[in-house]
Regions:
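Intrinsic-disorder/low-complexity accessory segments
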Residues: 1-9, 14-16, 20, 24-591
């Protein structure tokens, strides 16, 4: 009525479903509130010419104000009904919790950084979480004491807990989504988790309230002395890249150990997983005491585990002075940005990369508009990142220079359509579903002409036809190679990715070029059509190739999605630090 009175055309209950719980129009419904969404087109300045006439900035302010006043007025009139609704809602939530065969959720991770971030999220929503006080084996998976937690469903935040933990299985008649159809948060955080029935929940040894406040940091290693040869940083923790970046920016020498090793420490022998970073205490341009101060920061501020090694010799794994231990350098990152359009970059995708590097890893990022970048910028950087967007503004001359820069040691990282552009330009010998190289497009067009045309359809079904074959945001199960340097820090072979789009990498001649592939049965939560599931089964999500002295690393998806998909961020930081720690296989003789 408000908009009718203003003479403004409006629409309701079209296109925007309330399925995804992250919407402002959905999230309050998990907390006993009645949400309303009012979305308005921007004037993009003072005045914009639209299909409905001129849209003025002052008009948009008036409409927002009138909508807010009308909503508040209606809420005041319906106060008693809203209060009764909220009382019923919480009572119904308690009944639903008791009727649910799932009584609790348990979760754990070898990465206590991601585990801590998830605890903070639950605590921020006033969800009661309890540490497990003894080791538990649930569905064949070990949940270690004090490194695992359990959330019981019978509490005030029942609906929110279910929204966070449950696997999304949309109704069969709902195949069209505005964007996200699956968001199971333990998958997003890369946590092992399990739904517990009444028997399992009753046996779980839950104790003190779980939070990150007051949790003790790992034990400090001994201060340097004549007997401490090097410090070794365990790469398993989410914050390890930040700690290593700080060390590298102090111009210390550091190396990555490619295999699991057994170290001799002042406290005895210690097993350290592959990907650990070695920091020698001697022959550095910094005193041993100053080096130790950085190690103390890594332990106390970043929460990482650091060991003091007494010798280069290891009973198992690479010796610390071995030829397979690769030197690291501080990444100097160039991020392509610019307004989205025919030649522009997704500001969301670029912002997510900036946030991870600048805010979480403390890596400086140079951001240059895609229409202004030139060869001079390349020489000042070790890495260039192209996220989702359009790169038609990059000239053939720049592409040739980029290829030379990569061969000379540069690292190109592409995500989503940034990866598609790299494949099309032939930056590396990597193939992607539905993407043809520029020099092969004519041949591809001939192949398209030979394809069978689709069956005739009714035009009124076109919108659903277009949308149901799109993957707008599901959770896909993946298989990671944790022995590849880009997979260092992961425990086991399972990983979950946010899948948006229908692209994946084809297996090529390099049997080690696919670091992460989609599982044979990839859909873990949300919706993807049977056609897309079959098409993407076993295809690559992360592909990498050495090109001369440099590397090309491509993601079919966005590993930094909305800054909360922590489970795949390690893949991105590995691409920064370990991009030259892998090699191409030797050529095979032709049969």
């Amino acid at each position: 009525d408000v908009f009718d009175g203003l003479g403004q055309l409006s629409v309701s209950q079209e296109f925007f479903p309330n399925y995804y719980l992250g919407y402002g129009s959905s999230y309050p419904s998990l907390l006993g509130a009645v949400p309303f969404l009012f979305e308005q087109g921007s004037a993009r300045g003072m005045v914009q010419d639209t299909d409905n006439g001129l849209k003025r900035y002052d008009q948009t302010i008036l409409e927002q104000f009138q909508a807010a006043v009308a909503l508040l007025g209606e809420a005041a009139q319906q106060r008693e009904r809203l209060q009764a609704f909220q009382q019923r809602w919480f009572a119904d939530s308690s009944d639903k919790a008791r009727a649910n065969p799932t009584k609790a959720y348990a979760f754990t991770s070898n990465d206590q950084g991601r585990f801590a971030h998830f605890l903070d999220l639950l605590n921020a929503h006033a969800i009661d979480v309890r540490f497990l006080e003894s080791d538990q084996t649930i569905d064949g998976t070990l949940y270690p004491a004090n490194r695992s937690a359990v959330v019981y469903l019978d509490q005030a935040r029942y609906a929110l807990i279910e929204g966070i933990f449950a696997v999304q299985t949309p109704p069969e008649d709902q195949v069209v989504f505005y964007d996200i159809s699956g968001w199971t948060l333990p998958h997003a955080f890369g946590l092992k988790h399990a739904a517990l029935n009444a028997r399992q929940a009753g046996r779980s040894d839950a104790g003190t309230a779980a939070s990150t406040a007051g949790r003790s940091a790992p034990i400090l290693p001994p201060a340097p002395g004549d007997d401490v040869l090097a410090y070794v940083i365990d790469w398993s923790h989410f914050n390890a890249p930040r700690a290593v970046n700080r060390i590298l920016r102090h111009e210390l020498r550091a190396k990555v150990i490619p295999d699991p090793v057994r170290l001799e420490t002042p406290n005895g022998f210690v097993d350290v997983p592959r990907g650990a970073v070695l920091v020698p205490t001697r022959r550095q341009d910094m005193s041993a005491d100053d080096i130790y101060a950085l190690i103390v920061r890594a332990v106390e501020e970043d929460g990482v585990t650091v060991h003091a090694s007494l010798t280069s010799r290891t009973p198992s794994g690479s010796d610390l002075g071995g030829f397979s231990v690769d030197a690291l350098e501080a990444p100097k990152v160039l991020l392509l940005t610019g307004r989205a359009g025919a030649s522009g970059v997704s500001d969301n995708d670029a912002g997510e990369v900036w946030h991870y590097l600048d805010q979480m890893l403390h890596i400086p990022v140079t951001m240059i508009d895609v229409t202004n970048v030139n060869s001079r910028h390349l020489s000042d950087h070790t890495h260039i990142i192209a996220v989702g967007g359009a790169y038609g503004a990059l000239s053939d001359g720049f592409v040739d220079t980029l290829k030379s820069w990569i061969r000379d040691g540069g690292v190109f990282i592409g995500t989503q359509s940034g990866a598609e552009w790299a494949v099309a330009q032939g930056l590396a010998d990597i193939d992607m579903l539905g993407v043809e190289r520029v020099d092969e497009e004519a041949e591809a067009k001939e192949d398209e002409d030979e394809m069978d045309p689709p069956a005739p359809g009714s035009y009124e079904d076109k919108l659903d036809y277009d949308r149901q074959e799109r993957i707008t945001g599901a959770v896909f199960a993946g298989v990671i190679d944790p022995t590849h340097p880009l997979g260092f820090g992961y425990d086991g072979n399972e990983i979950f990715v946010h899948k948006e789009g229908e692209k994946g990498f084809e297996p090529g001649d390099n049997p080690f070029g696919i670091v992460v592939r989609y599982a044979d049965t990839p859909l873990a939560s949300g919706y993807a059509s049977a056609t897309n599931l079959e098409r993407l089964s076993g295809k690559g999500m992360l592909a990498a190739a050495r090109v001369g002295a440099g590397s090309v690393i491509l993601f079919a998806d966005n590993p930094n999605f909305r800054a909360y998909w922590l489970g795949t961020k390690r893949l991105f930081s590995n691409s920064l630090f370990f991009a030259r720690a892998f090699s191409s296989p030797a050529p095979r003789p032709e049969k």
